[in-house]
Amino acid sequence: MLDNHYGLQPRARGGVNLSSKLRGDVSVIDDLHQSGCMRVLFPRGSKTLDAVLINTSGGVTGGDNIAVVARVGAGSDMTMTTQAAERAYCAQPGQVGQITTKLSIDAGGSLNWLPQELLLFNNSNLNRKLDV
């Protein structure tokens, strides 16, 4: 008889903690911490800090845990987006993928939060929290 019990695979964990500050009239990185499957790219130099979030695991499924924290410092400007459409893949029964995003803006700062669309696959199970 076949054993139909599948062990749970290790899941993706990742986080980004990014803050900006104003240096002269240009917004720059104040602090940056990246862990696990999450990375940030800064595609061009401009007066605004442009940040592109990348999930190197390719998507989220049950048991994954992703956390993004961004703070825009006083007077600075930041635009954050994702590299491509986010994907929530099929999850094992009882397994939930978690994405938590915390955004804060100090006095005189501005933030453009522009994530790409979310693609939900059959039987995906995702819990997303956005705290501004």
PLM feature segments, named:
Residues M1-I99, A107:
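Terminal catalytic/cofactor-binding subdomain
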